[in-house]
C-alpha cells in the first residue's frame, strides 16, 4: 500500500510541475510580444529581433522541456517574421 501511495504522490508532483511550466510559457509569450512591439517599425522579418530574443528563448526551452514543441512553434513565427511583425501592433 505504501508503494502505491508514493507513486500516486509522484504523479501529483509531475502534474503540478507541468502546470507551472505552462504558466511560465504564458509569461514568456507576453515578454516576446512586448519585445516585438518595441522593435516595430523595422519592417517585416527584422533580423535584429532574433538577436534580442535569442537568450530569452534559450532560457524558456531549458526551463520548460515538457513543452518544447509548443515553444518552438510559437517563437518560430516571431523569429521568422510572420504577419505580426509588419509595423506596430
From Swiss-Prot:
InterPro entries (alphabetical): HssA/B-related
Pfam annotation, one family: Coiled
Family per record: Belongs to the hssA/B family.
Protein name: HssA/B-like protein 21
Gene name per UniProt: hssl21
Amino acid at each position: 500500500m505504501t508503494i502505491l501511495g508514493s507513486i500516486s504522490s509522484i504523479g501529483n508532483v509531475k502534474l503540478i510541475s507541468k502546470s507551472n511550466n505552462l504558466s511560465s510559457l504564458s509569461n514568456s509569450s507576453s515578454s516576446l510580444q512586448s519585445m516585438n512591439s518595441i522593435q516595430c517599425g523595422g519592417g517585416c522579418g527584422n533580423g535584429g529581433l532574433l538577436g534580442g530574443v535569442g537568450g530569452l528563448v534559450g532560457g524558456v526551452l531549458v526551463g520548460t522541456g515538457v513543452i518544447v514543441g509548443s515553444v518552438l512553434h510559437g517563437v518560430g513565427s516571431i523569429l521568422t517574421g510572420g504577419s505580426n511583425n509588419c509595423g506596430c501592433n
